[in-house]
Amino acid sequence: EGDAAAGEKVSKKCLACHTFDQGGANKVGPNLFGVFENTAAHKDNYAYSESYTEMKAKGLTWTEANLAAYVKNPKAFVLEKSGDPKAKSKMTFKLTKDDEIENVIAYLKTLK
């Protein structure tokens, strides 16, 4: 289990592209409030790529395992889960340290 307070600090690295507040604006990436245990591409007011809408159609949910794999390597995750060989992700930033990943996921779990 991660540490949500530590995860909130780590999430500051994500603020260039994401917001975390309920009802917060989308930026380059979607607002992440309520992402945990939600389906991929769940924000109605964000223009997701076809790869993400394909993952949604396949029923992909943002579980701990999926979030961890995604933040480690977004492009590889989207390629694998969407089944689209041309899949892309705007997210180029990666979290590489397991403790940071666990902490960010713990923080995302509190945003509901």
Swiss-Prot record:
GO terms for biological process: photosynthesis. One of its GO terms (molecular function) is metal ion binding. Keywords: Electron transport, Heme, Iron, Metal-binding, Photosynthesis, Transport. Heme c binds at C14, C17, H18, M91. Binds 1 heme c group covalently per subunit. Gene3D superfamilies: Cytochrome c-like domain (1.10.760.10). It holds the Pfam family Cytochrom_C. It comes from the Bacteria. Belongs to the cytochrome c family. Cytochrome c2 is found mainly in purple, non-sulfur, photosynthetic bacteria where it functions as the electron donor to the oxidized bacteriochlorophyll in the photophosphorylation pathway. However, it may also have a role in the respiratory chain and is found in some non-photosynthetic bacteria. This is Cytochrome c2. It comes from Rhodospirillum rubrum. The gene is cycA.
